Amino acid sequence: MCSEFLSELHWEDGFAIPVANQENKILEDQLAKLREEKSNLQDQLHDYEERINSMTSHLKNVNQEFLFTQSLYKARESEIESEEHFKAIAERELGRVKNETQLLEKEMAIIRERKSQMENNIFKTTQKLDDLKCQMNWDQQALEAWLEESAHKDSDSLTLQKYSQQDDNKIRALTLQLEKLTMEYNEKRKLLDSELTETLSAQLELDKAAQDFRKIHLERQELIQQWENTIEQMQRRDQEIDNCALALSRIKQEAREKEGVVKEKIKFLENEVENNIEYERKISVAERKVSKCRMDYQRHEGNRSQLKDELDTLKTTLNRTSSDLQALRKNISKVKKDIFDETLRLQKLKHHNEVVKHKLKMITEKTLSIEEKATNMEDMLKEEEKGLKEVEVQLGIVKDVLFKKVQELQNEIAKEKALVSEIEGTRSSLKHLNKQLHKLDFETLKQQEIMYSQDFYIQQVERRMSRLKGEINSEEKQALEAKILELKKTMDEKKSTLSLLESQIKKLHNDLYFIKKSNGKNNDEKESLMNKISELNLFIDRSEKELSKAKAVKEDMMIEDNLLKLQVKRARELLYSKAEEVLSLEKRKQQLGKDMEERAEEIKVHKAMLTSQIRCVEQQRKTMSSEFHERLSKIDKLKNRYEILTVVMLPPEGEEEKTQSYYVIKAAQEKEELQREGDSLDAKINKAEKEIYALQNTLQVLNSCNSNYKQSFKKVTPSSDEYALKIQLEEQKRTADERYRCKQRQIRELQEDIQSMENTFEVIGHLANNAKEKLTEKQTLAFQLRKETEEQKPKLQRITKQCGRLRREIRILKQTDNETLEEQDIQLREIIQFHKDIDQMLVNAMENAEIHAIFKTYFEQNGLELPTARGPSSRSSSQSSSLSSFRSLEDVTLQSPPTAKVIQLRFPEPPPATNDSSRSASSGSNSNIPKEKKLSK
């Protein structure tokens, strides 16, 4: 504003800007105050106007709401009146329906009474009818007597006819009355049904009307509800509008206030922009320095975090390996115990086998009978079988235990892998999060820098303004001095942190070295344990082979025993066959006697049966003839009765008379029926007579058979043909029996051979399965080891890179290009560790007796001592020796390296005719040593 005003006045730049005097300054202040008051009053005026407008709109809305509520109130009143009216109508209808129901109930009661009366009347009439029928149904004998008398007394019959006609007339009259009453009842029922249908139709119409009314009522209620909802929505919107208006007024006021503040700040900014330009150069220089320091700090922080992560991983691996080691040691101790127990049992079994063999020899030497030998052999076999079963059971238990342990080991390894993968995943996620955190920190730092630069720029502008005004601030100088002091302090702090970090890095290097060392030791222990496990597996294989040999010996013994048993069986069978022949002949004799007695009893019973049947048939014939005579007499009686009935049962007056031909036909039909019955009875009699003749014939046949059977039991003479045939058949039977026994023996022998072959096949299969399982286990173990080595390779590369970087840094810090004392110490320790590893390998290899002898000869030839297994004391001594070597290295730097004595070992090749066990043992012990190896000492 000032510059524009001066340009309008054509003020030159060389001259100073005119400044107002004291009075003008006071006037300017007053003017500014008045302007502020004016602006405030204008703002208040605007607020009041807006409030008035909002109040007027609110009043309009309130009036509208009032009108809506009044109309709603009226609608509700009309609805209440209509509901009361409907309620009164419903009450009236209810009263009317109750009256109608009472009337209907009364009518129903009257109808029930009438119905009961009618039923009583019907029951009485039916009783009377039944009595009349009973009177009519006279007894046949009385009727016959009455007919005989009626022949003499026609007058009595006429009177009877009259009475019967009277009774018939009465019955007809009663039936007519009944029909009339039923007709009336049906008409009344029809009237009742029609009235019911009318009432139902009226009720349905009423229900429809009520439904329509309910629908209309519901629609009306819905309309009122919609009305209420709209009113509520309008009220809500009015409230929202009021709130919005208030908020708008408040926002406008705030906007005005902010506009004033912004104007003031713009003025202040214009003044400060000029001051900021001067300090930008200094800030850029300081920023460069700070950015360099930050970059160094971030690099050191990254290195520190990386080293910390590696330390954590190494610690976890150490803990895991130590726990695995303990578990393996426990398992190995258990397996050793089991193996020791098994060896003891094997020795016992061998001793037992020797005792059994001795007994066998003793038994064979003695001249005992075949049966005694067989019993002894059976006892011995039983004892041997028991022992073998026990051994098999124990072996099975041991195998199960071993299998379980192997499975547990595999499960633990799988768990370990899963945990390692989880840890790696969490580490990667942690690294990712750390990176994100670093990024965020960097961004916040950038924002702080920007803020700082802005503040600095504002301060520069303020200073420029003060300089333009001609004011010099001592506070600025003090602030700058304070900032310089702060920066110096921060520099000192950074230096101290740098020194701390360097010391920590050194410590970490030392820790890393010790961890590597311990890791190497753990690996050695692991390898030794694996070798021991392989040796145990070999021992188990050997024991299994010995067991298979024992089984083969046992099978041979069993075969010999079976042969002896066969001989005994043959002798017994010969004995039994002779005894059986004698017994069979005696039994046959007894059986024939029993059969004779049974046959005689059967014949007696059969005779008695036939006689009883004949009696029954004669009785039936007599009964039939008596029935026939009775029926003839009945026919005569029926004829007489028929003649009487024809006279009595004359048709009444008004009915047609039945002709004589009708009765003749009826009589002929009855005669035919009787004739048929007579024919059927004759046929039955003829049939019974034929059966009697047939039974007599069968009796004769049975008698002839019995006589033949008696003759067959007579003694046969040696000169007869039957005797010769008997002898021939017996010889054929004997030859057939011998053939059958031979075949049975052959079948048994074949079955035994098959069984033995199956047993051997099962044993071989079992051995093959075991071998396959072991092979798979070994393959999985090898695969796991390969995997572990592959996993460790990137870590090793990373560590080597880190070591190289750290070496370079240390050399830079020490300002040397040659190897430092620390590096030389590390190399020395590595060489010592390498020597220890070779010693340990040699010790592990020398556990085998053959290899130990070879090593001993070669070492004695070269005048060297054999390496021994080291304990914890040797480790401590090695550490002390490494320290002493480190000290000695300080003095000796340019000496020549010591000469190494080389031993060339040549192992003798195994002969070709060696068994599998020796091969497996040699392969297990020499798994880590080649045929030719050079050892530097």
Curated annotation (Swiss-Prot):
Coiled-coil regions, chain positions: 16-137, 165-339, 365-615, 664-816
Key words, A-Z: Cell projection, Cilium, Coiled coil, Cytoplasm, Cytoskeleton, Phosphoprotein
Q: Which ranges are annotated Low complexity under compositional bias?
A: 873-887, 915-928
Gene Ontology CC, one term: cytosol
Q: Mark the residues carrying the PTM Phosphoserine.
A: S888, S896
Q: Where is this region: Disordered?
A: 866-937
One GO BP annotation here? neuron projection morphogenesis
User: Which tissues and organs express this gene's product?
Assistant: Strongly expressed in tissues rich in ciliated cells. Expressed in olfactory and vomeronasal sensory neurons and the respiratory epithelium. Expressed in node cells carrying motile cilia, in upper and lower airways, and in ependymal and choroid plexus cells.
Q: Where in the cell is it found?
A: Cytoplasm, Cytoskeleton, Cilium axoneme
Q: What is its main location?
A: cytoplasm
Name the job this protein performs.
Required for assembly of dynein regulatory complex (DRC) and inner dynein arm (IDA) complexes, which are responsible for ciliary beat regulation, thereby playing a central role in motility in cilia and flagella. Probably acts together with CCDC40 to form a molecular ruler that determines the 96 nanometer (nm) repeat length and arrangements of components in cilia and flagella. Not required for outer dynein arm complexes assembly.
Q: What is this protein called?
A: Coiled-coil domain-containing protein 39
Q: What organism does the record attribute this protein to?
A: Mus musculus
Lineage, opening ranks: Eukaryota, Metazoa, Chordata, Craniata, Vertebrata
What gene name does this entry carry? Ccdc39
